[in-house]
Amino acid sequence: MNKTVVVAMSGGVDSSVVAYLLKKYTSYRVLGIFMKNWEEEDSNGLCSTAKDYEDVERVAEQLDIPYYTVSFAREYRERVFSRFLKEYSQGYTPNPDVLCNREIKFDLLQKKVVELGGDFLATGHYCRLDVKSQRVGLLRGKDPHKDQSYFLCGTHPESLKNVLFPLGDMTKREVRSIAAQAGLATAQKRDSTGICFIGKRPFKSFLEQFVPNVEGEIIDYDSQKIVGNHEGAHYYTIGQRRGLDIGGSEKPCYVVGKDMEKNIVYIVRGEDHPLLYQQELTAKELNWFVSPESITRCSAKVRYRSPDEECEILHTGTQDTVRVRFTSPVKAITPGQTIAFYDGERCLGGGIIEVAMTPHSV
């Protein structure tokens, strides 16, 4: 009897092509499943869930595959969104996509796949798996512009044992071409960007619905003078330049620190200001695809679009945290963001940035 693969279909071109490739070129029995993580009424209809589901229906019917829908809205709110709000209110800048992969897609959705009689879960992620050894390995996707291993660095290896990433060896251009040649209904659909529960709204207007505004001061760190006011330090992230509304300087202003107790935002002037650069950080909530004791030197990404930075991992004697020392100073390391570790194309693991060390305290 042929094995069954359940495709996580988002209504986008990537997951549509995954379903198409598995249906056309494999002997698997292919099912589609649409995962709803956010109640549309909570986002004033801006999360496009209904339109996305319509696109899933159209593609599934084109391919003649059964399709299902499942709602994890309550679990998403409890396990992802509530933490997102808590961390923002504490001054961190969390990445909900990394948490969603760990808590929802490769946990709850995996369990749903089993309920449906599935042997595998397939998604449209641009990354690859190494299943040759007992421990599943995570590799970068072939397309460096679309590689999504960063977003999976926090997902436990055991959760990826029965997962397929058919797009891992493909570029986005190739995927678009396949979708067009196959006449898929989503072939011309634009890629989704940003956080789904925010939709098209400005981030601040969304967040202020859940975290109250508290007016405070913006202070120039060097002069210690008040240079502006804000409606809440939680709205600002380290390295932020836009939205400060501070004049009187030829050099651009950047957020360099926040005092959450006093509700103060500190800025510096000039993109080369030394306080914008850090050479060491502490990471927590670690997840490894290899034995951590075997890692001394590697490279790391401190945010999705950042370049790889050469670093040394200093083990602290506990399994909960590590110190990371970079070969060269790195700009705007942001507590709350995910750090992913690499050795070439192999993702070694990841964690959450707890604190970045600067030569001076901010």
Curated annotation (Swiss-Prot):
Disulfide partners: 100-196
Binding site for ATP: 8-15, 35, 124
Subcellular location: Cytoplasm
Residues covered by region (Interaction with tRNA): 146-148, 303-304
Matching HAMAP family: tRNA_thiouridyl_MnmA
General function of this protein: Catalyzes the 2-thiolation of uridine at the wobble position (U34) of tRNA, leading to the formation of s(2)U34.
InterPro entries: MnmA-like, MnmA-like_C, MnmA-like_central, MnmA-like_central_sf, Rossmann-like_a/b/a_fold
A GO MF label: tRNA-uridine 2-sulfurtransferase activity
GO biological process terms, semicolon-separated: tRNA wobble position uridine thiolation
UniProt KW Kinase keyword: no
Chain spans, region Interaction with target base in tRNA: 95-97
Catalyzed reaction equations: S-sulfanyl-L-cysteinyl-[protein] + uridine(34) in tRNA + AH2 + ATP = 2-thiouridine(34) in tRNA + L-cysteinyl-[protein] + A + AMP + diphosphate + H(+)
GO cellular component, as recorded: cytoplasm
EC number per UniProt: 2.8.1.13
Sites annotated Interaction with tRNA: 125, 337
Family, per entry: Belongs to the MnmA/TRMU family.
Protein name per the record: tRNA-specific 2-thiouridylase MnmA
Enzyme active site: 100 (nucleophile), 196 (cysteine persulfide intermediate)
Pfam families, alphabetized: tRNA_Me_trans, tRNA_Me_trans_C, tRNA_Me_trans_M
UniProt keyword list: ATP-binding, Cytoplasm, Disulfide bond, Nucleotide-binding, RNA-binding, Transferase, tRNA processing, tRNA-binding
